[in-house]
């Protein structure tokens, strides 16, 4: 069972399996296997009356029963629960498939989101036992180009447009900067498809960075409406977050990716991080670096401008709330531990605190934020030249990656 957010490449994994079988790069025991994709939506479509869905389900089961060496892929597999049981039809596809799953007649691969997996499979423990969940995380920006190569070749053939490795790398960076909520590899593929359509309409044979920029014309338009002073403040703000993470040594569960000053609707700029496979210790050093990173934008823009805008105010609010939550969860403070000794817990083991205790915790958090603020300010002042470098690149290009800055610092 492939479990992950929409767009992270669950179907791409199955396509890679197909290619490995065709090219015989898979384990020898899978030579000669056929991969069949089952669309639950197609099976349900038009099955209003009794017997129509049962006929489709029976045909599928008979096909599987009469063939060997099959891998059955069901995308959005959570739809099998209740599929076919609407109106006059009383058969559920999950029930129809259970005998096959019990006999291991074929290899079944399902794909769904985390929420749909938990919501649907929690209702049927027997079905849940038949699938081993494999959690699929969004690939890193560095891994996207090689991951989408086969799909990119299809797009190039369809649009009759070639894409250089330089433009491909640029697209993965810009796409994520402009739409951080969408997931790769689907995000980059969608942007490439749209950019290649633009290039094709203009009679071009090669995709350029300008074609990619046209996909995000609205973002560029919003950036161009900002005056130079406003751009500079945003650049220094994001550079602060960027450099604080660049200099960190204890935030091992996250990796710095990029910073951008392009307005995205939610904010005027963004600094992005990716999760790593490492586990954070949540000790004092880790907590201080996390809070310091949250405050760094506010501190950095203060180097060039007096007063605080909405972004700087938000930094302080988020840092204080984040630290307050961690103090309540992990302790971190002798004074808080004295408070929690006398607190009671509810049925979910959460502390029930009096208003007086809550006020004390808020004061503890504020005091610690002030301490971390001073430490982070000192660190950033000592590395102001790096902040200036990052801000300069942001003002010039709009987007800068961690690898680009690390390369410049080597020189």
Which residue stretches match the model-derived regions?
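Walker A/P-loop
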Residues: 1-29
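Conserved C-terminal helix/linker of AAA+ ATPases
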Residues: 32, 114-117, 163-168, 184-220, ...
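Short glycine-rich substrate-engagement loop in P-loop NTPases that contacts/grips substrate
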Residues: 36-64
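Conserved catalytic/switch belt of AAA+ P-loop NTPases
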Residues: 61-62, 74-107, 115-126
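A short helix-turn-beta junction within AAA+ P-loop NTPase domains corresponding to the substrate/partner-engaging
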Residues: 122-137
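Short conserved motifs of the RecA-like P-loop NTPase core
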Residues: 148-149, 160-179, 211, 216, ...
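AAA+ ATPase "lid" subdomain C-terminal helix
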Residues: 157-158, 173-186, 190-207, 220-225, ...
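Soluble catalytic regions of large protease machineries
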Residues: 231-238, 242-411
């Amino acid at each position: 069972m492939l479990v992950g957010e929409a767009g992270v490449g669950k179907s791409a994994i199955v396509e890679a399996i197909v290619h490995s079988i065709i090219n015989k790069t898979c384990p020898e025991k899978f030579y000669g296997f056929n991969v069949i994709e089952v669309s639950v939506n197609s099976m349900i479509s038009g099955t209003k009356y009794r017997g129509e869905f049962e006929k489709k389900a029976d045909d599928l089961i008979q096909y599987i029963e009469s063939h060997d060496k099959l891998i059955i892929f069901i995308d959005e597999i959570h739809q099998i629960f209740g599929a076919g049981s609407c109106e006059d039809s009383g058969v559920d596809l999950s029930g129809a498939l259970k005998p096959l799953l019990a006999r291991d007649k074929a290899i079944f691969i399902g794909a769904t989101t985390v929420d749909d997996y938990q919501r649907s499979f929690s209702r049927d423990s027997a079905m849940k036992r038949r699938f081993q969940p494999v959690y699929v995380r969004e690939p890193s920006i560095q891994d996207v180009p090689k991951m989408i190569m086969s799909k990119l070749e299809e797009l190039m053939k369809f649009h009759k447009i070639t894409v250089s490795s330089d433009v491909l790398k640029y697209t993965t960076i810009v796409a994520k900067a402009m739409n951080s909520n969408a997931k790769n590899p689907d995000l980059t593929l969608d942007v490439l498809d749209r950019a290649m359509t633009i290039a094709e309409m203009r009679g071009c044979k090669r995709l350029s960075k300008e074609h990619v920029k046209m996909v995000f014309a609205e973002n560029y338009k919003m950036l161009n409406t900002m005056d130079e002073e406003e751009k500079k403040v945003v650049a220094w703000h994001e550079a602060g977050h960027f450099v604080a993470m660049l200099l960190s040594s204890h935030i091992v569960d996250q990796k710095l990716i990029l910073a951008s000053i392009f307005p995205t609707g939610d904010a005027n700029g963004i600094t992005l991080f990716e999760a790593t496979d490492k586990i954070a210790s949540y000790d004092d050093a880790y907590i201080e670096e996390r809070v310091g990173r949250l405050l760094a934008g506010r501190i950095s823009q203060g180097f060039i401008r007096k007063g605080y805008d909405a972004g700087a105010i938000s930094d302080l609010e988020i840092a204080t709330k984040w630290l307050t939550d961690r103090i309540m969860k992990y302790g971190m403070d002798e004074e808080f531990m004295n408070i929690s000794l006398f607190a009671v817990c509810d049925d979910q083991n959460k502390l029930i605190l009096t208003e007086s205790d809550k006020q004390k915790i808020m004061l503890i958090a504020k005091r610690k934020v002030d301490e971390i603020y001073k430490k982070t300010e000192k660190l950033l002042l000592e590395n102001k030249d790096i902040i200036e470098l990052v801000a300069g690149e942001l003002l010039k290009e709009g987007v800068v990656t961690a690898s680009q800055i690390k390369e410049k610092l080597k020189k």
